[in-house]
Amino acid sequence: MHCPFCQNPDTKVIDTRISDDGHSIRRRRVCPKCSKRFTTVETSMLLVTKRSGGVEPFSRDKVISGVRKACQGRPVREEDLKLLGQKVEEDLRSRGLAEVTSDEVGKAILKPLRDLDVVAYLRFASVYQNFAGLEDFQSAIDGLRE
């Protein structure tokens, strides 16, 4: 790591801490040449491959936004949505992959959403799984009853 003050290529790490969400590392560094201290933050990037073939960074906010639409008019708090987004991201990152498909993201949303609100689950599943008719809804409802 180059010192941002004097561009010395050799710096020393004096403190390392993992962030609260566990997805980034904060390092406090010192430059032996100019003695200035600075902080770096290291994060790993999780990429999502879309059905169209495009690739974009994973966005917890995008997950929350999609689930929020399914929860519209339901007694679901914003804190619950944020927690669901965190659970989905943790699930995907725990797989140890640098890239996941949008289908895997959708599947990762279903379980925590089902636990949160079954009506919102049915709404989300109907779009995600492309329900064609009442039979698909009935099948999903039967699955919830099991």
Curated annotation (Swiss-Prot):
Pfam families: ATP-cone, Zn_ribbon_NrdR. The keyword S-adenosyl-L-methionine does not apply. One of its GO terms (molecular function) is zinc ion binding. InterPro entries: ATP-cone_dom, NrdR-like_N, RNR_NrdR-like. A zinc finger (unnamed) spans 3-34. Binds 1 zinc ion. Negatively regulates transcription of bacterial ribonucleotide reductase nrd genes and operons by binding to NrdR-boxes. It comes from Bifidobacterium longum (strain NCC 2705). This is Transcriptional repressor NrdR. Keywords: ATP-binding, DNA-binding, Metal-binding, Nucleotide-binding, Repressor, Transcription, Transcription regulation, Zinc, Zinc-finger. It comes from the Bacteria. HAMAP family: NrdR. GO terms for biological process: negative regulation of DNA-templated transcription. Its cofactor is Zn(2+). Belongs to the NrdR family. Residues 46-136 form the ATP-cone domain. The keyword ATP-binding applies.
